[in-house]
Amino acid sequence: DSRLKEFVNVFPNNTGTFGYDAWGFNLKKIKNNIRFVKYLYESFFKVEAFGLENIPKEGKCLIIANHSGQLPIDGALIGYAMLSNPSGPRAPKAMIEKFFPTVPFVGNLLNSIGAVIGDPVNCERMLSNNEAVIVFPEGVRGSNKLYKHRYQLQRFGNGFMHLAMAYDTPIIPVAVIGMEESIRSYANIKPLAKLVGLPVAPLVIPYIFPSKAYIYFGKPMYFKNDTQNES
């Protein structure tokens, strides 16, 4: 529909001859997948987003969120909330775990719709390009935690803070509620994870629960790069 076409037009068309940008993003793939994400956002999870006015309309920023739900669905929902933001739509990038390219088809698919390997160099380049970048500092510690540990924040990596200070970049804190219930893991089968070369092998109920989701975008936070006073 016309609204979806408007969303697609928000994405920068800075792709090369073969239709891909430097990180593997492909505008055609977005056109093919955005309708499904719209369904997840509006109908399946019935997402309510708050604080959208806090997202800068332009310029670099880091979207720092909690992570849960086994699959990167929460990242897709955050991205759609930003893309459909009535206060000023933005097409963000999202940092993903380094093991995703080892999963057949998944890595290329995620790259094609705006996901980028979670490497500091990639993030630096995107911030230099004035991108809005979604980061989950908990990583797999958050997304693959057991259901009994739901809503318990896991340790945050601090790489995003160093980048925010080094590149004078505002941090937009984000809380996602509801995805803990979407896919429920009851155990991590470590021998299997080691065998297949993945960080985790969750024992899950093979069903995605249509849990109601809420996304809260906080006000921008700025941190001064004061390395001279570090001890």
Q: Each predicted region: which residue ranges?
A:
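Membrane-anchoring hydrophobic helices of lipid-metabolizing enzymes
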Residues: D1-M82, P86-G114, G118-V121
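Non-catalytic C-terminal accessory region of glycerolipid acyltransferases
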Residues: D1-K29, R125-S231
